[in-house]
């Protein structure tokens, strides 16, 4: 009868590990989705900050780029790619502006928030992608059930 107790203990341990793995993988994927939403909000906030300066000299191109950023949703893969290109164009245009104390602080703060949100999102996506290769996650085929999180390929706005 002792072998039955050992068998029950092994099954319980494997079941607990499987439950822990599923919970961890799902939690990391949920965090990646949440951080992507936060990144999109910070990118929208930066575009709105740029739109405050409509009519200022030298801001015509940057305002047009900010409008194109706001106009592109990120729901499909193609829209996401277009949004990445638009964000990169906006970042490059903002770098080319000569800083003016009237608006430089607002844009620097918005860029820092975007950079922080981008870094957090990248970290969560990295962790979620790594969790998909855990042996128990592969055995339970979690990589088929959960969509693979995607990195945002945007330039660092703080450089």
Where are these regions (language model features)?
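A helix-centric hydrophobic-segment signal that preferentially recognizes long
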Residues: 1-159
């Amino acid at each position: 009868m002792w072998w039955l107790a050992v068998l029950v203990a092994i099954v319980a341990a494997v079941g607990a590990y499987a439950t822990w793995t599923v919970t961890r993988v799902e939690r990391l994927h949920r965090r990646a989705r949440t951080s992507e939403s936060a990144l999109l909000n910070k990118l929208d906030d930066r575009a709105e900050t740029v739109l405050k300066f409509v009519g200022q000299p030298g801001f015509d191109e940057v305002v047009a780029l900010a409008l194109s950023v706001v106009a592109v949703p990120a729901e499909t893969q193609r829209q996401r790619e277009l949004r990445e290109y638009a964000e990169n164009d906006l970042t490059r245009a903002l770098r080319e502006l000569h800083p003016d104390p009237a608006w430089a602080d607002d844009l620097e703060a918005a860029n820092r928030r975007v950079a922080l949100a981008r870094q957090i999102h990248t970290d969560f996506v990295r962790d979620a992608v790594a969790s998909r290769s855990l042996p128990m996650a592969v055995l339970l085929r979690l990589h088929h059930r959960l969509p693979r999180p995607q990195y945002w390929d945007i330039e660092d706005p703080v450089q």
